[in-house]
Regions:
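Catalytic core of pol beta-like nucleotidyltransferases
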Residues: 1-39, 43, 48, 54-62, ...
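Short hydrophobic/aromatic beta-strand micro-patches
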Residues: 70
């Protein structure tokens, strides 16, 4: 029996944990979400807004908006997408790649390209539910969707309910993957910080030491009430107890569980690194996107020669290896 079964069945708690999903987005995010839904056609079930624009965490006006597009079936979704916009691969190739290290990532612009651009992760409802239940091989989806996100568009009431339910379960199960890294006693802010730090450790990222603090500060108003409600719910169900510092674990996880979770996150990082090859094949303008993100997040300006732009798979390796060895995240790990 899942030790979180009673928590997952707590209707009052689930209502509290849906907080923020219906928050009002920016006009640009709304326009992009509607354009994305149109592009994926009748097989689109929902569009979830996540990332720096959703969190209001230092996003620039010209940076891409991040979305998860939840679809019924990859086949139908990609037939619609490839007929609506120009893509780097055909529908059959995209469908095949969707089953290899999901999700696929695509760049999609609003009509006429006037209202920004979006970076879309495409996942079936089944795939979202597997991620919510911690039944995926890596942390890509969970690491993004446990944060402040908005459900901007849904095909119908049932689709909205299905996707909201999966997002709420994802929030509940943060305790499942975060518990081994928590101190014996903690408060809601420490809980959120540990979740962010643990998720960041599972990916190769360009950010410096202060990125987790920036994210926590930007999402504080949205995240702390949600995860305070979760911790209160875990206390009601006997998984936590009240302590002088907020909450206290009733049963501290054994060392074997911590090692198992550490192994999961190491595998997740390896899968995330390999997944970049798929992003390159699918994401139009991937090279400029990566260079801009490195500059924005790490402060490192990467100047590319014409030869590196034309044949990146041949000539870009020395700069890529140098950055991976000297990025702020790597320097922090060596301390």
């Amino acid at each position: 029996m899942d030790f979180l079964d009673q928590v997952l069945a707590d209707r009052e708690l689930r209502t509290a944990l849906a907080g923020g999903l219906d928050a009002e987005p920016t006009p640009t995010a709304r326009i992009l979400a509607n354009a994305i839904a149109d592009a994926f056609g009748p097989g689109a079930l929902a569009v979830i807004h996540y990332g720096s624009h959703a969190q209001r965490s230092d996003a620039r006006a010209d940076s891409a908006h991040d979305f998860f597009v939840i679809v019924e079936r990859y086949h139908d979704a990609y037939l619609s997408l490839t007929s609506a916009i120009d893509t780097s691969v055909g529908p059959r190739t995209a469908e095949v790649l969707a089953h290899v290290l999901p999700p696929n990532i695509h760049a999609i612009r609003a009509p006429d390209g006037r209202d920004g651009r979006s970076k879309c992760a495409v996942l079936t409802l089944r795939g979202l539910r597997l991620a919510a239940r911690m039944e995926t091989a890596d942390h890509f989806t969970q690491g993004r969707l446990f944060q402040n996100v908005q459900l901007l568009w849904a095909r119908d009431d049932q689709s909205r309910e299905d996707v909201s339910s999966a997002l709420v379960e994802m929030r509940i199960r943060t305790y499942q993957w975060g518990q081994p890294f928590l101190p014996q006693s903690f408060d809601a802010e420490t809980y959120c910080r540990v979740l962010l730090e643990t998720s960041f450790s599972a990916e190769v990222r360009p950010e410096g030491d202060d990125r987790v603090t920036q994210l926590l500060d930007a999402q504080r108003v949205a995240l702390l009430p949600v995860y305070s409600a979760l911790l209160d719910g875990l206390t009601r169900h006997g998984i936590l107890e009240r302590g002088k510092d907020g909450y206290r674990q009733v049963v501290f996880p054994p060392l074997a569980e911590r090692r198992r979770r550490q192994r999961y996150f190491r595998i997740s990082k390896a899968r995330g690194t390999v997944r970049w090859a798929k992003h390159i094949a699918l994401y139009d303008g991937w090279l400029d996107y990566v260079v801009q993100k490195i500059a924005r997040r790490s402060g490192v300006a990467v100047e590319l020669t014409e030869r590196e732009r034309r044949w990146p798979f041949i000539f870009l390796w020395p700069k890529a290896i140098l950055f991976l060895r000297t990025r702020p995240q790597q320097r922090r790990m060596r301390k």
